[in-house]
């Protein structure tokens, strides 16, 4: 993700990225996120004053799980866009995390949705949710993984541990 979509969205919704970030910070307060939570940009790219805790990420995912449109996006493994004048074949988007986690032992947990991210300061990060074999909803947030595959293994290990 090159963040072009969120930049276009921020301009459409608020007129500018800065105004959109103001809405993001307002919403963070309304959601009861930590006092440390502060957005400096809409993309999530590193900025020295851009802060979020692991708990904040979990709270955002928990709220996203309740939103039908967000659920649909976060649960989609593959999406094929229709052709456009710039991409005659359309574009294909793939959530590699959702595909890769299926190759791991997650203790019988069915991982349903995930959002991955990377910035050099926090390495590979994932927030995901799934349903344990006992029917319990689980939400896992990890950061600091050294590679995309390590992030998958870290998540699978935690799902396995907490699904029992």
Regions found by a protein language model. Give the residues of each.
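Short helix- or helix-capping micro-motifs
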Residues: 1
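Active-site-proximal cofactor/substrate-binding loop regions of enzyme domains
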Residues: 4
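Penicillin-recognizing serine hydrolase domain
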Residues: 11-164
């Amino acid at each position: 993700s090159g963040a072009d979509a969120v930049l276009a969205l921020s301009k459409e919704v608020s007129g500018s990225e800065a105004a959109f970030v103001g809405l993001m910070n307002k919403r963070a307060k309304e959601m009861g996120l930590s006092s440390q939570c502060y957005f400096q940009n809409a993309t999530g790219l590193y900025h020295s004053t851009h802060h979020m805790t692991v708990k904040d990420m979990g709270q955002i995912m928990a709220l996203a799980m309740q939103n039908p449109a967000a659920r649909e996006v976060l649960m989609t493994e593959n999406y094929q866009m229709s052709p456009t004048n710039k991409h005659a074949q359309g574009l294909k988007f793939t959530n590699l995390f959702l595909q890769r986690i299926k190759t791991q032992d997650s203790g019988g947990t069915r991982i349903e949705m995930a959002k991955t991210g990377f910035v050099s300061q926090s390495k590979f990060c994932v927030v995901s949710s799934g349903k344990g074999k006992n029917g319990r909803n689980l939400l896992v947030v990890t950061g600091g993984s050294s590679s995309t595959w390590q992030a998958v293994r870290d998540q699978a290990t935690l799902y396995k541990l907490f699904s029992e």
